[in-house]
């Protein structure tokens, strides 16, 4: 069992948006699709004649063709992590059950198969925080409230900078409390509190920088919503916004911490190292946009490349094919950047190789998690069917949107 002390000296909600009121109670209503598939109407379309059959690109090619490994601490960490987040947000039994199926610990387990139990628990809790935090901006109360979005980010930034008040588990702001515990943990060694040398100031600055990129993307996303520009943007503008708001940047740096990777400044600041981070973020979000297409249609989520290309005049299949081309181009961009990287020396290059492994595991884990947890499908079995056949079935009445 993994225990921690917060130092008391923050695509999950299953289609339900969480509402956390001043009494620290979680309420939910059908609103967005960051969790497992749970729509009774979906089963009404069993007749293939009523479905549009979309052929997906091979999403397990190139860097994604390698076998994944699972962290040996997965089972014990999952039990503790699921129980803790449900307690912190005072979730009801229905939410807690769904959260177990979403399985953020599995995602973290593929991301960092060799990290300690403490680091895996921190990564799983970061995933819980990120999805709860993000839901407020996606389809929640901040999705069209630019001032409110900027204010919530400012309060969260204060936590990261150490200028915020200490929150508690029974706080009126449980998402902020979760994030505060994460900041406490990431300042420590990934083996555990006081288990070894704590994180360097250099690394914590990088961790903060990655979160700032995420928050800049969220603000840009809300501004786009307010201006009603979701479908008037070009693909490049969409990618520029989504690679930030996706949250991949801080997740990647969090995984660096889990492995004890502290990139020297000459490596971390090299433009090609950042370019590789951009490339893998693009790959993750483009894969997500294909797999989540039906769910985004159902829930009215506009931030989807397939939907954007359809608004430009492409058919659904043409749009999916085009996104497949973009994904393959990510791999070309990756190998091109890799070939142009200089040698930094033995110690720095060792850290760089660890960083590259983290990047690959992050993309692979996100892909497998989408299929294996039924995140975007009726069930794990439906996800397995889509992976095997590469056929995505969309009700025709929905495909016309």
Curated annotation (Swiss-Prot):
Q: Does the keyword Metal-binding apply?
A: yes
* A GO BP entry: isoprenoid biosynthetic process
The residues the record assigns to binding Mg(2+) 3 are 292, 296
Cofactor (UniProt): Mg(2+)
Where along the chain is substrate bound?
A: 242, 295, 375-376
Under Gene Ontology molecular function, one entry of this record is: terpene synthase activity
Q: Specify which residues bind Mg(2+) 1 according to the UniProt entry for this protein.
A: 134, 139
Q: How is the cofactor bound?
A: Binds 3 Mg(2+) ions per subunit.
Which keywords does UniProt give here?
Magnesium, Metal-binding
Q: Which domain of life is it from?
A: Eukaryota
Alphabetized InterPro entries for the sequence: Isoprenoid_synthase_dom_sf, Terpene_cyclase-like_2
| UniProt domain comment | The Asp-Asp-Xaa-Xaa-Asp (DDXXD) motif is important for the catalytic activity, presumably through binding to Mg(2+).
| Protein known as | Inactive (1R,4R,5S)-(-)-guaia-6,10(14)-diene synthase
Naturally occurring in which organism (per UniProt): Gibberella fujikuroi (strain CBS 195.34 / IMI 58289 / NRRL A-6831) (Bakanae and foot rot disease fungus)
Gene encoding this polypeptide? STC5
């Amino acid at each position: 069992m993994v225990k921690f002390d917060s130092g008391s000296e923050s695509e999950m909600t299953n289609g339900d948006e969480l509402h956390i009121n001043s009494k620290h109670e979680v309420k939910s209503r059908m609103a967005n699709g960051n969790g497992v598939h749970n729509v009774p109407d979906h089963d009404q379309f069993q007749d293939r004649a009523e479905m549009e059959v979309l052929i997906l690109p091979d999403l397990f090619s190139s860097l994604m063709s390698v076998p994944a490994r699972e962290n040996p601490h997965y089972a014990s960490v999952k039990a503790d992590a699921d129980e803790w987040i449900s307690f912190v947000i005072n979730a009801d039994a229905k939410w807690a059950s769904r959260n177990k199926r979403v399985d953020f610990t599995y995602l973290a387990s593929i991301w960092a198969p060799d990290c300690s139990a403490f680091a895996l628990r921190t990564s799983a809790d970061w995933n819980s925080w990120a999805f709860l935090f993000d839901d407020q901006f996606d389809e929640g109360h901040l999705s069209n409230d630019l001032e409110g979005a900027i204010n919530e980010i400012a309060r969260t930034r204060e936590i990261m900078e150490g200028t915020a008040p200490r929150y508690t588990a029974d706080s009126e702001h449980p998402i902020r409390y979760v994030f505060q515990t994460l900041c406490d943990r990431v300042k420590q060694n990934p083996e555990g509190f006081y288990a070894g040398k704590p994180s360097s100031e250099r690394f914590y600055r990088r961790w903060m920088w990655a979160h700032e990129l995420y928050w800049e993307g969220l603000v840009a996303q809300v501004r786009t919503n307010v201006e009603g520009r979701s479908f008037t943007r070009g693909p490049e503008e969409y990618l520029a916004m989504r690679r930030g708001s996706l949250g991949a940047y801080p997740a990647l740096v969090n995984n660096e911490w889990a492995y004890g990777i502290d990139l020297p400044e000459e490596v971390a600041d090299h433009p090609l190292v950042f370019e590789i981070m951009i490339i893998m973020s693009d790959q993750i979000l483009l894969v997500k946009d294909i797999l989540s297409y039906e769910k985004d249609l159902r829930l009215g989520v506009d931030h989807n490349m397939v939907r954007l290309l359809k608004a430009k005049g492409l058919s659904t299949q043409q749009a999916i094919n085009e996104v497949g081309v973009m994904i393959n181009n990510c791999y070309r961009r990756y190998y091109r950047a890799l070939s142009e990287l200089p040698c930094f020396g033995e110690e720095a290059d060792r850290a760089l190789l660890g960083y590259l492994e983290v990047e690959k595991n992050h993309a692979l884990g996100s892909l497998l998690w989408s299929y294996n947890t039924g995140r975007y499908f009726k069930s794990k079995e439906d996800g397995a069917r889509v992976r095997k056949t590469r056929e995505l079935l969309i009700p025709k009445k929905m495909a016309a949107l």
